[in-house]
Amino acid sequence: MERNHTMTTTTRSRPSRITPQINNQLDMFDLLTLAEPITAPLSFTVDPYTPEEHHKACERWRIEHRNLGIWGKSHMWHCSGYDFGNNRTVAGGHPTVLMSADTRCDHYYPATCSCVGDLLYRMHCEGCGHVTGIHARENAAVEEHLDHCWNGWRNLPTITRKGQDGPWKIPDDYPTEWQIEGAPVRTLRQPMGTRHVPGRSPFGGYDAGTLSP
C-alpha cells in the first residue's frame, strides 16, 4: 500500500522593524514609545543633547532593533542604568548624568583592522546645563564637570571612612562651605582603585579618588 506524502510549505513574513511583535501581538508600550517624537539621532553624535533625549532615542533603537548589541551596533550615547539612577548624582544644585558611547568595532583576534573607535564619556549637569567635552577616560569627564560646577575641589583635603560602608571621618577643620548637599570629596586610594564614584560622597556628590593627599 502506497502512501502519498504531501509537503506543506509555510512562508513566514518578516516582522516589521517599526511594529515589533511579541507572541503575534503588538506590545502596546512599544507602540506608545514609537509614537513619541525623538530629537537625538539613532547613532553616535558629537552634538550635545539632554540625557532624556538620548534615553528616548535609545528606547526607539531598542524597539526597532531589539536589544541585541544595542550599544556596540548603534554607538549611541547612553547612561547605563538610567532608569535605576545608576551613574548619576541627584543631590544639590548640580545633579549629574554620566553618558558613555561605544564607538569600537566588533573585530576580534586574529582579525585586524584600523578602526579608531573607543569607549567615550561625557558628563551632563542637569542643574546648570553644562555638558563636558568628549573624553576617552571616565575620570577625565568627571573632573571637567567638577572643575566647572565645583571649582576648587582639587584643593580639598582628603577624608577617610571606616571600612567600605562605615561612617565618614570628616576633620573638624574641614571647610564648611564644602559641607553642603551635592558637594564632592577627595579620598586616598590604591593605584588600581581611583575611579570617581557618583553619589558616594557623604554629601551626595562624587567621591573623587586620588593617589596623593
Q: PLM features: what roles do these ranges have?
A:
Residues 21-91:
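Negatively charged, low-complexity tracts enriched in Asp/Glu with abundant Ser/Thr
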Residues 64, 85, 111-113, 131-134, ...:
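Secreted/processed peptides and extracellular or luminal domains of membrane proteins
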Residues 67-101, 122, 154-213:
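Intrinsically disordered, low-complexity, charge-dense segments enriched in Lys/Arg
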Residues 136-160:
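C-terminal recognition-helix end and immediately following basic linker
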